[in-house]
Amino acid sequence: MDDDKDTIFTFELYLKSIGYTTVSFFNPIEALGYFNKNFATCSLVITDYGMPQMSGIDLIKKIREKDENYTKKIILISATVKGDILTDYYEELSNLKVNKILEKPMSLETLKNAIRTLIK
């Protein structure tokens, strides 16, 4: 989930090339609707922090309302990881059991390693 089409396209193309099945969204509300309908088949959510319709943190809160046992892995990506996210939202992200925070831009190798660490 990212509102940047280039990021989505790059991630999706790469992840499919290394064997992952992906479903991508530019709109967090549509992503949440898909997640709620397909909860059983989703194992990992990758979401951007800053999006116009809903923040990544708000999206994660909604996901965790459905995923009360924290079974779904979550990677939060952002261009502002070193700033406000880690300082202002650290406790909240910990409570929401965000599994990994990655700073954009990142290498595809970094993304792959983060996913492989979470999904074995």
Each language-model region and where it sits:
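Active-site residues of response regulator receiver
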Residues: D2, D48
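Hydrophobic/aromatic residues positioned on beta-strands within the core alpha/beta folds
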Residues: I77-A79
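Acidic catalytic/metal-coordinating carboxylates
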Residues: D6, N27-E30, S55-K61
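C-terminal output helix
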Residues: E103-I115
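Short amphipathic alpha-helix used as the core "switch/output" element in two-component signaling
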Residues: G33, I57-Y70
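Acidic, metal-coordinating helix/loop segments flanking the phosphotransfer/catalytic sites
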Residues: S24-L44
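Receiver (REC) domain active-site loop signature in two-component systems and cognate sites
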Residues: M51
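Two-component/phosphorelay signaling modules centered on CheY-like receiver
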Residues: K5-V23, L96
